[in-house]
């Protein structure tokens, strides 16, 4: 017997199905063999689905990268035995450089201080550390402004124990502002062209979240970062008619109380529901404290 009156069930088979669908959606790659590579986003405990069990499914599906927010998440997966390459989306502090190297994580870099610290510890370990450089093309948060990115990358390329494996940006409004998103892609494309002319050997260029993957086909992008769609959620209405995803999470609850109410009685906060006829009302033990908006 389930001791919980309200619970969540996660269907790992649905996640397996969804990642296979996402692979088929990925366009031909730019400069890589086969299709665009897939980085599955499992930050924030895999959006509440359970980071470790979801990661194990994705490892069996041979995804190219796992995407996490921070160092703590990365260490958790490594201690769970996950060996797939892990990209940390958040830039970290220089004081965390040693742990990044010790746990074989790939950091996102947008400060000289972090780059120098990584290079220092990599020299001590006699290894080369892969990094990705975050370029700000309009999100306005993390990242080097795209106008300054070429100079920043050139300086980092002089650090012998770092390898700039990828550059990335982020779309703030891919589902609502196509013109702005296309402008971001163009800015990133300009940077890629500049890097090629300077003989830079960067393997991955990435920006596409779920909406970016299905809504934009940019030749320069060769690594996609789907999040929502991995869990069976659609980034825009109507997409479910074209893409067959399966929801991975379901919420269940048991009725704990039944009551008859007459016409005109109101129910719960704000009295937003008023009975138009006599009816039976069921109460479920789930609410505001569980994240279910009243």
Place the predicted regions along the sequence by residue.
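Catalytic metal-binding/acid-base residues of hydrolase active sites
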Residues: 138, 172, 211, 229, ...
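A structural micro-motif recognizing beta-strand termini
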Residues: 284-291
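Short Gly/Ser/Thr- and charged-rich N-terminal loops/segments
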Residues: 28-35
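A short, Lys/Arg-enriched amphipathic alpha-helix followed by its capping loop at the start of a domain
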Residues: 21-28, 60-61
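Active-site-proximal beta-alpha core segment in soluble small-molecule metabolic enzymes
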Residues: 2, 6-9, 14-17, 35-206, ...
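Anionic-ligand-binding alpha/beta catalytic cores of soluble enzymes and soluble regulatory domains
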Residues: 178-277
